[in-house]
Design a protein with these regions (language model features):
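Alpha-helical transmembrane segments and immediately membrane-proximal extracytoplasmic
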Residues: 3-302
């Protein structure tokens, strides 16, 4: 009788453990799908910013422009992987919240908040940074989970990683404005004696290069942020199984994560985002090909 009892308890515990593991795995899959949906939304939301000037100057049609941007969004994968050699931005996002406070629930909540805000700003045609929204959602969910800024002497937020990122949110527009100003003044002085029609043609061609550089920067930055979120979720899952690893170790062993992230943002870019293109390209200011080259180059550098 005792042996039957032990067998019964063993079967129940095994079934329960297996059932819980299945639920955790299902939750993980949902989070990965949500992260890639966010990446897709990022594509048609933020990539519109990178093609607005090239569309408003009529260098490319909206359809041509989104294809152009999508190609270079995806090409950023090869730059990150084989030229730079690492996914540093993804690592920053994955480690923006200390490991002790990361759970699948935290990541799920952060993603839902970021997706909701992205769709809202897209609906109203408001330019905003999807990737910084994702970072904010992740940190906000972690703070809500912890119920405080720190616990047992450990900060919820990894400030050494996060503070430079948030400082750059405010500094980037100013830096971009200064660089754009300098580029424009320099080009105007160099091409002062050029024939207006000939100069305009040259700037239209140069805008193809500057918009490509901008799209490379967009893909290289924003796709990696989604990689960071997926990486954080996968690392948490592996931790529950007794395997501890860093983000870069995980990514190097699971190249499907960056491939999926860069593919999702590229497909999102191809889906458009015309409302934001109209706002960026015509409602904020009318731009010429010269100004388009300057703005896109400044944005790519920043």
């Amino acid at each position: 009788l005792d042996e039957l009892k032990h067998l019964f308890y063993f079967l129940v515990s095994t079934f329960t453990h297996s059932h819980i593991s299945t639920l955790v795995m299902a939750f993980l899959v949902i989070i990965i799908i949500l992260a890639l949906i966010f990446d897709f939304i990022n594509g048609f939301h933020d990539a519109a910013n990178s093609i607005a000037t090239i569309v408003s100057t009529k260098v490319l049609t909206p359809f041509q422009a989104v294809l152009w941007a999508a190609v270079f969004n995806f090409a950023a994968f090869f730059i990150s992987r084989y030229v730079i050699g690492e996914f540093r931005i993804g690592n920053t996002i994955a480690s923006s919240v200390n490991k002790e406070f990361i759970t699948l629930g935290v990541i799920f909540s952060g993603l839902i908040g970021a997706i909701a805000w992205n769709l809202l700003t897209w609906w109203f045609g408001i330019p905003s940074s999807s990737s910084h929204t994702l970072l904010g959602g992740f940190m906000g969910a972690a703070l809500a989970h912890a119920g405080a800024l720190s616990r047992n002497g450990t900060d919820v937020i990894n400030y050494a990683k996060v503070i430079p990122t948030f400082l750059f949110i405010f500094l980037a527009p100013v830096i971009g404005m200064v660089i754009g100003f300098v580029i424009t003044i320099t080009i105007v002085n160099i091409s002062r004696k050029a024939h207006p029609y000939k100069a305009d043609n040259w700037f239209r061609r140069l805008q193809l290069i500057s918009s490509a550089l901008f799209s490379l920067g967009h893909g290289g930055n924003d796709a990696q942020k989604v990689m960071g979120i997926i990486g954080a979720a996968m690392i948490y899952y592996e931790k529950t199984k007794g395997h501890d690893m860093t983000f870069l170790q995980f990514i190097n062993a699971n190249m499907w994560v960056p491939m999926a992230s860069f593919t999702a943002i590229a497909f999102g870019t191809m889906s458009g985002g015309w409302k934001i293109v109209k706002t960026m390209g015509t409602r904020i200011t009318k731009v010429t090909p010269l100004e388009g080259v300057s703005a896109e180059t400044a944005g790519a550098i920043t």
